[in-house]
Amino acid sequence: SSDHCGPLQRLKVKQQWAKAYGVGHERVELGIALWKSMFAQDNDARDLFKRVHGEDVHSPAFEAHMARVFNGLDRVISSLTDEPVLNAQLEHLRQQHIKLGITGHMFNLMRTGLAYVLPAQLGRCFDKEAWAACWDEVIYPGIKHD
C-alpha cells in the first residue's frame, strides 16, 4: 500500500463516502447525478448500458443497476482499511467487469464523475487528493483488466 493512499486517506475516503452515500432516495439521486455526469463526458458510453435501459436513468432497471454498482463500490470503500477483505472485493469486481467488457475508459469516466458529484454532496469537506490517490493507487488498479 502506498503513502499517498495511506491509513488517514483511506479513513477520510470511507467517512466521506458514508456521508455522501447516505440513505435510500439520496443514493438514487447521487447515482443519477453520477451517471448523467458520465454520459455527459461520453454519450456513447450509454450503449454499454442497453441491457439495463441506460437511455432512461430514471427507469426501474437502471435504478436497480445503479444500486448494484454502488453496493460494490460501498463494499470496496468500506474495506479500504482491511487489506485482505479489500483485495477479495477488488478481485470479485475485476472478474465481473471482465465478463461485462467494461474498459478502463469507463473507470476514468466514473473517476471524473465522482470528483464532480461528491463535492456537491460533501461541500468543503471533500478531500480531492485523498479520493484521487485511493482511486488511482488502490481501487482502479485492483479492478482494471485491459
From Swiss-Prot:
What does the UniProt keyword field contain?
Disulfide bond, Heme, Iron, Metal-binding, Oxygen transport, Transport
Task: List S-S links within the chain.
Answer: C5-C134
State the source organism's domain of life.
Eukaryota
- Where in the numbering of this chain does the Globin domain appear? 4-146
Per the UniProt record, the source organism is Tylorrhynchus heterochetus (Japanese palolo worm)
**Protein family according to the UniProt entry:** Belongs to the globin family.
Please, what other remarks does the record include? Giant hemoglobins of worms are formed of a monomeric subunit and a disulfide-bonded trimer.
Q: What is this protein called?
A: Extracellular globin-2A
Keyword Cytoplasm on this protein? no
* GO MF annotation, one: oxygen carrier activity
List of residues binding heme b: H97
Q: Which InterPro entries match?
A: Erythrocruorin, Globin, Globin-like_sf, Globin/Proto, Haemoglobin_extracell, Mb-like_M
Quote the subunit structure annotation: Disulfide bonded trimer of chains IIA, IIB, and IIC.
Gene Ontology cellular component list: extracellular region; hemoglobin complex
Protein's UniProt keywords contain Disulfide bond:
yes
